[in-house]
Each structure stands twice: as structure tokens, then as C-alpha cells.
Amino acid sequence: MEYYNVGKIVNTHGVRGEVRVLATTDFIDERFAKGNTLYLQQSGEPLPLTIESTRQHKGFVLVKFVGYDNINDVEQFRDHELMVSADDQQPLDDGQYYYHQIIGLDVETTDGRHLGKIKEILSPGANDVWVVERPEKRDLLLPVIDEVVKNVDLDKNFVTVELMEGLE
């Protein structure tokens, strides 16, 4: 089964078994909802953890898992990734994509020039920014806006962009 990262446990919180999670998903309310199962990446098989409660606190998501009732139970989870199974991913609207679908796509301009591959996605504020790794040049930062991104073709594994003045 495939799993996708939705956050990282960065620390424990309090003594009653809560963990502090740095979320890496755009769907915080859905992913960290009571009753959902997340998987802890560890050596061997991912460990399924059912969410008992969740709340926001100072930019983090505080999560309590069923059956883990004190700090000693969850201390071992620190610095581990939390994942969701591919089966649990919600279908997205047209024109919306999961990060794992975008990373690795080839990038071409509207006139057919190959620019490189998307290696990372940044979320600095108003819109995402795709980091395009280019051979023998520094990385290109592409804002994900309609004026720049013209087409995403997941079947053919490429994105068509129109470079605005000053981007390259």
C-alpha cells in the first residue's frame, strides 16, 4: 500500500499523551479529524494510530491517539512522520492536485522548450511556488497562478507554463 506524508511529530505536549504535529497537508481539518487513522512511519510496517482528539495550538496541531494516554506512551513517536494511506485520499476538484502528483513532472514552455523537473513545492503565502530543477542552471521558481501554469497533464507527465517577464 502507498502512503503519503501529512505531518511530522515534532514533540510531545503535556503529560496526557498529546503530540505536537507540524502539518504538511492542505487538509488539516479532514486529515486530523477524530476517528481517522494515520500511520506512523517507523522501521518495518507503518503503525496505524486512531485519532481520539485534535486541536490547534500556536501553529501546530495537537493530536491525542486512542490507547496512548501519557507522555511515556508517545515519547517514542517524536521526529516520526505521520502518513495517510492512498485509499484515504479524498478526490480533488478539477485543476487541483496532490503534491505527490506534481513533484517529478517535466516542465515545458508554451513554445515547447523543456525547462526541467519540479523537485519541490513551497507554500509561502497567497499561492504555491513550484521549484523547477534545471540542468546546469539555478532552480527556477514558478508561482502557481493561472497566468503562468497553462496545463497540467498527469497522464503524459508534464506541465505547460508561460513564463512571465522576470521569472527566468
From Swiss-Prot:
Source organism of the structure: Limosilactobacillus reuteri (strain DSM 20016)
Name this protein carries in UniProt: Ribosome maturation factor RimM
PANTHER family: RIBOSOME MATURATION FACTOR RIMM (PTHR33692:SF1)
InterPro entries noted in UniProt: PRC-brl_dom, PRC_barrel-like_sf, RimM, RimM_N, RimM_N_sf, Transl_B-barrel_sf
Signal peptide feature range: none
Record keyword Cytoplasm present: yes
Gene (UniProt): rimM
Limits of the PRC barrel domain: 94-167
Domain-level remarks: The PRC barrel domain binds ribosomal protein uS19.
Compartmental location: Cytoplasm
One GO process term, biological-process aspect: rRNA processing
Primary role: An accessory protein needed during the final step in the assembly of 30S ribosomal subunit, possibly for assembly of the head region. Essential for efficient processing of 16S rRNA. May be needed both before and after RbfA during the maturation of 16S rRNA. It has affinity for free ribosomal 30S subunits but not for 70S ribosomes.
GO cellular component, one term: cytoplasm
Keyword terms, alphabetized: Chaperone, Cytoplasm, Ribosome biogenesis, rRNA processing
Major localization listed first in the record, in broad terms: cytoplasm
GO molecular function annotations of the record: ribosome binding
